[in-house]
Amino acid sequence: MVVKVGINGFGRIGRIVFRNAHEHSDVEIVAVNDPFIEPHYAAYMLKYDSQHGNFKGDVTVEGSDLVVGGKKVRFYTERDPAAIPWSETGADYIVESTGVFTTTEKAKAHLKGGAKKVIISAPSADAPMYVMGVNEKTYDGSGMVISNASCTTNCLAPLAKVINDEFKIIEGLMTTVHSYTATQKTVDGPSAKDWRGGRTAAQNIIPSSTGAAKAVGKVIPELNGKLTGMSMRVPTSNVSVVDLTVRIEKGATYEQIKTAVKKAADGPLKGVLAYTEDDVVSTDMNGNPNSSIFDAKAGISLNDHFVKLVSWYDNEWGYSRRVLDLISHVAKVDGNA
């Protein structure tokens, strides 16, 4: 059974989720809402993308709706989530990708329009967070609003799970070397809450904060309080990389750690965690659907208890694929797929 999905917010993640759904046979996008663009512009932005190339399919406009691959997709321009008539489109699951309605109270407004569940494509202060390959099996159908966490947490958590399961993490620090995003500046500009964040993204390496490492403690309770981290925003348009440095309780050589990660990548975490020994660079990961691609050649160890691990992620494409995977999983648990 195909799960019918609506998207609120047709920005980077909203559009990349749509593109991924085109390759995701058990999910169908039936409606999109964005109050800041009209249908012809939405069609244009879906069709052409500077990072991921042209859309693989026909995109046209019929009246006020999109037609994608011959199928009509209702298009709305409501500012209030409660006013979006999801029920008339058949959309049961809503991807909340505006970056604005990230709390349970705000996101549940979609339920008034007939939606059954809301999946926030961002970290949430109070909604339950699920990371595919890590804790999605704890979902029991009770939450009306859930979060897919962040792209960085989706990269970090599967790797941290493998290391903790096999060797027990005592404590660790994470740095994500992260491509610039839409919230940053093309030229220096005002940013009262984050002065460094107001500097031009194209010329600077910008230290920034991230809650991604601490969020791992929410999806892997055993690691709560054991990890924290920061971000370095760099002048690349897409693809990021996690540097995880940990102390482990059970001594292991770097070769043993590589073996454990490869076993997980080829087994229970296949499709979420990948493993490579190639001499890759960031652009090689553009469009990679995995949450986390472990770079076996990039990591180092000081001794058998102190190690630095490196894992890549396409912070747009891989994350958006997990949003859809989470929806598919949730729908099956709910009995709607």
Curated annotation (Swiss-Prot):
This is Glyceraldehyde-3-phosphate dehydrogenase. The record marks 178 as: Activates thiol group during catalysis. Homotetramer. D-glyceraldehyde 3-phosphate binds at residues 150-152, 181, 210-211, 233. Belongs to the glyceraldehyde-3-phosphate dehydrogenase family. CDD domains: GAPDH_I_C, GAPDH_I_N. GO terms for cellular component: cytosol. SMART domains: Gp_dh_N (SM00846). SUPFAM superfamilies: Glyceraldehyde-3-phosphate dehydrogenase-like, C-terminal domain (SSF55347), NAD(P)-binding Rossmann-fold domains (SSF51735). Its EC number is 1.2.1.12. It is found in: Cytoplasm. Its main location: cytoplasm. NAD(+) binds at residues 12-13, 34, 79, 315. Pathway: Carbohydrate degradation; glycolysis; pyruvate from D-glyceraldehyde 3-phosphate: step 1/5. It catalyses: D-glyceraldehyde 3-phosphate + phosphate + NAD(+) = (2R)-3-phospho-glyceroyl phosphate + NADH + H(+). It holds the Pfam family Gp_dh_N. It comes from Cryphonectria parasitica. One of its GO terms (molecular function) is NADP binding.
